[in-house]
Each structure stands twice: as structure tokens, then as C-alpha cells.
Regions:
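Short, structured motif recognition centered on aromatic/hydrophobic residues
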Residues: 3-8, 19, 30, 51-57
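Short, solvent-exposed loop/turn elements at beta->coil junctions and helix N-caps
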Residues: 40-44
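Acidic/histidine-enriched, glycine/proline-rich intrinsically disordered or flexible terminal extensions
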Residues: 89-92, 96-105
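Short acidic/glycine-enriched loop/turn segments that link adjacent beta-strands
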Residues: 46-49
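An amphipathic, aromatic/His-enriched active-site/gating alpha helix that lines ligand/cofactor pockets
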Residues: 21-38, 56-94
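Short, surface-exposed ligand-recognition loops at beta-strand->loop->(often short) alpha-helix junctions
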Residues: 11-21
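Residue-level signal for secondary-structure boundary sites
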Residues: 15-17, 61-63, 102
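Solvent-exposed residues in well-ordered beta-strands and their adjoining turns
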Residues: 10-12, 56-58, 97
Length: 105
């Protein structure tokens, strides 16, 4: 069963560009590790401290394989470490969604 990991970030609105660089780095890392990056999103209007990331997987087993690869990915570890050091992510929540309908690719 296809699933999507929906990540909601509370970000420091004064470090928007730092989060943008963080999100852009995942554009290479996630596919290399086996995830299907659906996108990262920053606020355009409205609340300025919330961002989102969506990553698709064929099933939970595919997600577990992705996690194992990600742990050994040098660029992935560096991206996590940079986020911790620079503190532009204040909070992160993950929800797992069952894909009911997805737009054609």
C-alpha cells in the first residue's frame, strides 16, 4: 500500500533561507536513499513559521529500507547536523498517510 510521510515543520521565520537550503539538499538525498520526494513547501502568505515536506514510499518496508540508507548517507547526516547546529527547525511532526488518490505523474 503506497504511503506518504507528511512532515510539518515549525521554523524560525527569520531563518527562512536556511530552511530553504536544507529542503533543497533533500532533493538529491531522498531519491538516492529510495524515497520519492513529492516536495518541500514554504509559506507564501499567512503563517510565516510553518513549512511542509512530503515523501512517498511504496509501503512501510520501503520506508524502513530508506531509513537504513539515510543513516549511512554522508550528505544526509550533514544536512541533519546543519539543521541542529543552526536551529532553524523549532519543531517537527510526522504523519503517515495512506495514498487514496494521487495526481498522475
Amino acid at each position: 500500500m503506497p504511503i506518504t510521510c507528511f512532515i510539518r515543520y515549525q521554523i524560525d521565520p527569520f531563518q527562512r533561507e536556511a530552511f530553504k537550503r536544507y529542503a533543497q539538499a533533500w532533493g538529491e538525498i531522498i531519491p538516492r536513499c529510495g524515497g520519492r520526494l513529492l516536495g518541500y513547501f514554504l509559506p507564501h502568505e499567512g503563517s510565516n513559521d510553518v513549512a511542509w515536506g512530503l515523501i512517498g514510499f511504496d509501503d512501510m518496508a520501503a520506508y524502513e529500507r530508506y531509513r537504513a540508507r539515510l543513516r549511512s548517507d554522508e550528505q544526509g547526516r550533514a544536512n541533519f547536523e546543519r539543521a541542529q547546529a543552526e536551529r532553524f527547525i523549532l519543531r517537527e511532526e510526522r504523519s503517515w498517510l495512506e495514498d487514496v488518490f494521487a495526481a498522475p505523474r
